[in-house]
Regions:
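Walker B catalytic acidic pair
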Residues: 69
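Active-site-proximal or metal-binding-adjacent scaffold patches in catalytic folds
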Residues: 1-64, 73-129
Length: 129
């Protein structure tokens, strides 16, 4: 698993190589991210990444995810359309070869709870993360 310093260096390198522009903010690991590969913060321009994609077995997904978040970053700072629906976003994402979606990873054990109504016998399943 790579640490935050290595992540910062990787983001800075990919930004220069793929976009020709420096990344001047922070790249962080956010353990609360579960269903997405990363997130661009509009308020402070920092990038956050899901730690599942920083594990050795998932590192091959990371450059595509970093490029995706950097597309948001560079377009927003340039005053262009940075949202997924915007044409500018779609064109730049395709140009740099970023991931459109983060792949779904096998998560650590999830609990499934089974409930049965005592009156009617109806079964209910609850899945906890």
């Amino acid at each position: 698993m790579i640490n935050e310093q290595e992540l910062q260096q990787l983001v800075e390198t990919i930004s220069l190589e793929s976009f020709g522009r420096p990344f001047l903010h922070q790249a962080k690991i956010n353990r609360r991210l579960k269903t997405t590969g990363g997130r661009y913060q509009l308020s402070d321009h920092h990038l956050e990444f899901n730690p599942l994609f920083l594990k050795e077995e998932n590192l091959h997904y990371l450059p595509g995810i970093i490029k995706h978040e950097l597309v948001h970053y560079h377009l927003h700072l340039a005053g262009l359309g940075y949202q997924h629906k915007d044409r500018d976003f779609k064109l730049l994402l395709k140009k740099v070869g970023g991931s459109r979606y983060a792949p779904r990873l096998e998560e650590s054990k999830r609990s499934r709870w089974h409930y049965r109504c005592r009156q009617c016998g109806q079964d209910y399943w609850r899945q906890r993360q």
